[in-house]
Amino acid sequence: DNWMDSRIARFETRTYDWDALKFQADFDPKYARAQCRYMGTGGTGISNDENVVPAEHFTFSTMVLPSGCEGPPHIHVDVEEVFFMLKGSIRLTIEKGNDFFETILKERDLASVPPGYYRGLYNIGQEEALMLVMLGNKKPVTPHYPPDHPLSKIKRSKK
């Protein structure tokens, strides 16, 4: 292994991890989506993936969102989260206190969500959507859900 190899993550060596957020899909299939990690392990709670470029300042992954998929509202207390749409369209919701924002992200659109805001998404298209997800810390704190959301009651195992 040389230094260059340790800094490159090739698509051909990635796998779509449908289990990264499986506890959500087990609760309701509408939450089924796949993470493909490139740099760091992201904010899904996965920590044992050694097939990534080590994160130094942020994480970088893609998410495959089937048609009708919903990403439940969640909050990152420690990091900015950036979404960049590669394919498809999603409805993005952002909420903090009494402030509520909603927009449609299409191909090549970017949204930045600061720490401390709830964010959720829904694939409004008839085909799968693909988006880049970046979190602004090499080891983000696992996000949590609004207290009244059913997923907030589920205990998930560490991976």
Specify the residue positions occupied by each region the protein language model found.
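A short, N-terminal "cap"/entry segment at the start of jelly-roll beta-barrel domains
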Residues: 1-57, 149, 156-159
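Short histidine-centered beta-strand/loop micro-motifs
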Residues: 48-54, 71-77, 94, 102-104, ...
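His/acidic/aromatic-lined binding-pocket segments of jelly-roll/cupin-type domains
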Residues: 62-63, 74-75, 80-85, 103, ...
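Short acidic-glycine-tyrosine-enriched beta hairpin
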Residues: 96-115
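Conserved short histidine dyad/triad with adjacent acidic residue
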Residues: 40-49, 59-77, 115
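Glycine- and acidic-residue-biased ligand/ion/polar-headgroup-sensing regions
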Residues: 67, 78-91, 96
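Histidine-centered metal-chelating micro-motifs
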Residues: 70-72, 91, 110-111, 115-120
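Double-stranded beta-helix
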Residues: 1-9, 103, 118-159
